[in-house]
Amino acid sequence: ERVQKAETTSENMELSEAETRYLIDEQLRKYGWEADTNNIRYSKGTRPQKGKNFAIAEWPTDSKVSKNGYADYALFVGLQLVGIVEAKKANIDIPSVIDYQCKDYAQLIKPEHNEYVIKQWGSYKVPFVFATNGRKYLKQIETKSGIWFLDLRNNSNAPKALQGWISPQGIMELLEKDISSANATLQNTPFDLLRDPDGLNLREYQIRAIEA
């Protein structure tokens, strides 16, 4: 009964994927992304630009999962590919979209787009993926509401629901945390281990950079 009530009060409408994307456009813009499904799209010539935070619609990948491999949005901070977003209809289980679709897109970035890849985490060329139906998060219908997010940089991470989108600045702060964590690990590693051929086997100039 509680689930039925939540479903009827949540926007009280069934949106198509196209309608969902218009809703997501508006949400992304509120968080600092430049988003416009009709105009900021790959097929109309939009490409990443320095100083721009683009959510580029219909970004092509080599995925064979669905829609000829087009991700609904690719998120760029300047020239850096930082996220993939999938939009779904209201009756779709959102976390499952991350598992079977978003992950596939994040692995199968086209070779000609590698210039936008920050780095690779295992088989993933994109750090963050999102899936949503545009509906506000409701605990009663948890898997069919909210913005679901997965940080692909660590295999132990699981999808989780967010109350809102992450801004371009927030994305860069998340990426910086990853860098800071790696640097902290190096800073706390004994220099003998850094030099050890059976350890990290770093060169002297690399060790000096860590000491600096």
Regions flagged by a language model, labelled:
Residues 1-212:
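ATP-dependent helicase/translocase motor core
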